[in-house]
Amino acid sequence: MPYVKVGKENAADIELYYEDHGSGDDTVVLIHGYPLSGASWEKQLSALLAAGHRVITYDRRGFGKSSQPSTGYNYDTFAEDLRHLVTKLKLQSFSLVGFSMGGGEVARYIGKYSSKNVAKAVIISGVPPYLLKTADNPEGVDGTVFQGIQKAVTAERYAFFADFFKNFYNTDQYLGKRISEQALQASFNVAAGSSAVASLACVPAWHEDFRKDVAAINIPTLVIHGSADRILPIDASGRRTAKLIQGAQLSVVEGGPHAIIWTHADEVNAQLTEFLGKGAVRQAGSHHSD
């Protein structure tokens, strides 16, 4: 199995598990959400491969098959981890697609390293621009909400995950229709296998301030968000992010929950393949507008 070394903790290497599928110069890097792994992109992987892309997925530190260190659960480190991956794979031009927490990596990577090698960016149900309510960010969420989540994860993270996924997929509306009991259980199993340290330490990272990072995005960008997202309401995240990025396209999935990459995969995949282009037909970085 392929791994990339991103650091060390004591005598042990910190390694990220990744998968690299397809071929060609039109490369897409998919960055997963909390508390899942790169495998959560399965419905997008097949669609993007069919459209002629090379597709790379990886597991964030602490999740999936990657190492589970006790440190590094902040967006500067997450961006550095991503940098290690694209450097190892010698990617000269690639598009970044982030879901949920992964939207933060898209923003911070470009904010930290510029968009020099990034052709396009896609943020799906993302955490940017800034979730915490402050004097200069009145649209944010009260800090006590995040404190409550941390308490719930600390007290009994498995019970927290089970409850979290109800609003992740809006199961009261879509269970048995757009998501099966088996798929829901599979998500729980992945979450349960995550690092206990990571599942707690990532919560305060959700309210990282990405406003400067988002403002630095100067490449074609697509923001996709569900209108019924209960985890990251669209008005607090997706709509604001799209407004802060010059020329960004906003695509609203009507009735879509947080995890539209699963429940509304056909709609998301159509948007993705249209925006990213089909294989080498379109030059990397060329702008498409509806």
Residue ranges and their predicted role:
Residues R230-A236:
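Conserved alpha/beta-hydrolase "acid-adjacent" motif
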